[in-house]
Amino acid sequence: MPFPFKPVLAAAAIAQAFPAFAADPAPQSARTLNEITVTGTHKTQKLGEEKIRRKTLDKLLVNDEHDLVRYDPGISVVEGGRAGSNGFTIRGVDKDRVAINVDGLAQAESRSSEAFQELFGAYGNFNANRNTSEPENFSEVTITKGADSLKSGSGALGGAVNYQTKSASDYVSEGKPYHLGIKGGSVGKNSQKFSSITAAGRLFGLDALLVYTRRFGKETKNRSTEGDVPIKNKGYVFDPNKPFSSYQDYEAAGVARSRPDPQEWVNKSTLFKLGYNFNDRNRIGWIFEDSRTDRFTNELSNLWVGTTYSPATGDYRHRQDVSYRRRTGVEYKNELEHGPWDSLKLRYDKQRIDMDTWTWDIPKDYDTKGINSEVYHSFRHIRQNTAQWTADFEKQLDFSKAVWAAQYGLGGGKGDNANLSDSYDVKLYDPKIPTTSDTRITMLIENRSKYKFAYWNNAFQLGGNDRFRLNAGIRYDKNSSSAKDDPKYPQAIRMQIPHLGSERAHAGFSYGTGFDWRFTKHLHLLAKYSTGFRAPTSDETWLLFPHPDFYLKANPELKAEKAKNWELGLAGSGKAGNFKLSGFKTKYRDFIELTYMGGSSNDKNNPRYAPLSNGTALVGTPVWQNQNRTAAWVKGIEFNGTWNLDSIGLPKGLHTGLNVSYIKGRATQNNGKETPINALSPWTAVYSLGYDAPSKRWGINAYATRTAAKKPSDTVHSNDDLNNPWPYAKHSKAYTLFDLSAYLNIGKQVTLRAAAYNITNKQYYTWESLRSIREFGTVNRVDNKTHAGIQRFTSPGRSYNFTIEAKF
């Protein structure tokens, strides 16, 4: 297998070249409010951590999560179907195993456990359910790869994506009392148009910031070359009205579409901050954030086929998905010249996240039934409320040949998860006339949660000439949850919810340590060890589904998932550029997976005892439960570097770069057998060549992205079929993409940016898209046997982005 390592060999060659062209870097900035930086003379590079600042976000024309990680091969976006994404994939884990925080506040649980997706996601309910955030609101994004619960708490098993929102101080100061920024543009891949305004002002001790953004667009386009293919179930569909005449040769409703379902969507986002400085050392601030996305989808790819219980049907299904987030918060900052802290920040936030799905089915035979036609409506709602407080302290002590910078603090919070399911039928031509009663139920066990934490993180600069740096930290977390008791629960159901009304807690310590040795003027040896954990989500713990065809048992006895991460690297920086080469290994254990327990029993002492809500005990029904099962390991190599080519006599402003990630791993089953991990992305290398004019007026960048195929032998079919590959992996092929972007500054106020993606109009499948296909349910489907409709999952062809921004 020599080919996958070619980018790594190139990376090693570039690493050897950098020291020869290095020169003295500029001194680091000193400490600022709420940020302690150990003062030194060399540029600090951290293993497994990348910061993307506002300037880079603008340069890369970032409009969503896919744009954010487009040129970072070590992270990808988990596809979620029509309604968006399900978080990120980092180092072989995804979804809730990668933490997402905004200003330190955790975002919604993804509701993406296997059991939840089996029951709801497969039929189009919350198939994309991790809320996204507006890119125009952020001043900086920090991506951490590898276990990172020391900084990010529960969920940072494989890494974390931490967003930091803009502040008035990013734009105004004593010398500049106001700022106005206006930005607009278009995104070709989904016919998106957007506009955003950023306004900031400062008067006396008061400052304010407002960011308002509106986006609207359509479905994300693909690169399809085939037409829609009618689907048949083996060419026939069983007709229950004629049980003795074998199969009837009529066609099942629905088609294997080669194009995305028609969709229209709109997003509105508001960020408002208000602050007052009592003096140079005391400040109070208030924040308000509000964001809503509505998606209207004509679900033409929804597959309703005949079964042994019913003939083929084919209603037109329409959906509206709503994602809503509202946050308010207050914070207080203090600085002391002498005392137990140099800086203190107290913060309290309240957050509400709603994820809704509204479905309505219009019958295909409405033209023959006329006024008697009926429409089925279904509304599913999930709400997650969070309240969090934190107290963060920072202190730096300077000694003759050492500096000690400490960060310490504590915090806590509580959460509440509620849900609702409502369904009814109405007249097609007069929706005000119901034809059935309103069925309103709680579809999931509701729960409450609490958490608290305390941490102590230290950075030591040792020896003269800033040669040694040591980081060491510890954090304690305790997370607990309890299922809400409901008097409507039948006694049979109560018996199937152990510890109903009582708390189930997970507590433990997280650690992190790192070492930075500058062994030459421009080279550093880096080392890092860190741990991570993920407490079970609410649906993993409490989800109960008593049904004669599929019986799911709750499991409050789940243990937290855990990870250990080791990393070693070499870094260099200077006028010629910078680079970082690292190798890592991460071990995971106690993965939570949906487990088949066997057929149900009517023995109350049997763990497979499965009563229905009426008390009837099922016999022989498949029983499933979320359980801690597997362990896993991943290891790999990453390289990223930038080379300023004027260091070898080429024109000033010319630069090139390389970003490579290669990772492999295996899951270890309970029987000791090692199996592939589907969440591992194939190796990817991103090459870049760019020019920024010395006048800063214009620049151009070209990118070439090479991604290997995901081999079927590196996949598994499912947790219950570990001996066969994922059937759609055979469509994964290696591909190379070429992109081009440019900018032009017109005076000091106006900037034009444009980009062309997939210039060669390549047809390709990402691995994330292929592994999102379902073999059951009604959405994200293709024909299981012929794979007709697979081209619906191709990525966009050639597309163009454009933005214009004015700042005053």
Model-predicted segments: where are they?
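Acidic, small-polar-rich N-terminal luminal/periplasmic segments of exported/outer-membrane proteins
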Residues: 24-171, 568
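Transmembrane beta-barrel wall of Gram-negative outer-membrane proteins
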Residues: 188-217, 222, 226-298, 324-327, ...
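Gram-negative outer-membrane beta-barrel transporters
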Residues: 394, 461-466, 470, 478-479, ...
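Short strand-turn segments of transmembrane beta-barrel domains in outer membranes
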Residues: 140, 148, 160, 165-201, ...
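C-terminal beta-signal and adjacent terminal beta-strands/loops
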Residues: 110, 533, 587-590, 594-596, ...
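Face-selective signature of the C-terminal outer-membrane beta-barrel domain
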Residues: 277-291, 323-493, 508-518, 580, ...
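Outer-membrane beta-barrel signature, preferentially recognizing the C-terminal barrel domain
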Residues: 310-339, 447, 499-510, 514, ...
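Short loop/turn motifs that connect adjacent beta-strands in outer-membrane beta-barrel proteins
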Residues: 152-153, 168-178, 205, 281, ...
